[in-house]
Amino acid sequence: SPGQVAFTVEEAVAAAEELGAPVMVKAQVHTGGRGKAGGVKFAADIDAVREHATNILGLDINGHLVKRVWIEKASNIAEEYYASFTLDRSAKKHLGMLSKEGGVEIETVAEENPDAIAKIWVDPVVGLDEATTRAWVAAANLPEAAVEGAVDILQKLYTAYTDGDCELVEINPLILTPEGKVHV
């Protein structure tokens, strides 16, 4: 979703005014569990943006101090998914995970319902091709209307993961709108 980084409450308010409410106010820190820690909030109006930005900026999330927030247009959400890439050191391959259990802690899903996560292992030398991505999306049971958008986003996520030499990239949630559009 289009959005803007804000380092102050005033910048958050200005971003929300430019984007138009409702918006999401999201802590930008290098750790998981932002939502659980109060670092992701829906703001229906500018007063709520001001309140949430005030509360989130300076918040400690897992030992990380929040110094900036991301303000983005809120979306109509029909379904939420989780998508990620990380390195599976034992397999010496990249591990992609895609699950309809988006918006929650993926560690809990992996523990309690491992079959809810569609996994692929990608050889770093070969990379992730479109056919493999389509099969992965099919294994995760995304609706037909979401396939094209999901394939595009997941291939871009893999490129960001490899080009950025990352240990982990994730989208949570990957959003499916009532109109069948997919976006982050």
Go through the PLM ranges and name each one.
Residues 1-21, 27:
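A conserved helix-loop-beta module that forms one wall/lid of the active-site cleft
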Residues 1-3, 25-52, 82, 106, ...:
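Glycine-rich phosphate-binding loop of ATP-grasp-fold ATP-dependent ligases
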Residues 6, 41-45, 86, 97-99, ...:
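Short beta-strand-to-turn element immediately C-terminal to the catalytic PLP-Schiff-base lysine
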Residues 10-17, 47-54, 152-155, 159:
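Solvent-exposed alpha-helical segments within well-ordered globular domains of core cellular machineries
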Residues 19-34, 63-78, 83, 158-161, ...:
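ATP-grasp fold ATP-binding core
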Residues 46-62, 136:
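Catalytic core of tubulin tyrosine ligase-like
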Residues 63-121:
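Hydrophobic alpha-helical hairpins/lids featuring a short glycine-rich hinge
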Residues 121-183:
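Glycine-rich, mobile lid/loop segments that gate access to catalytic sites or pores
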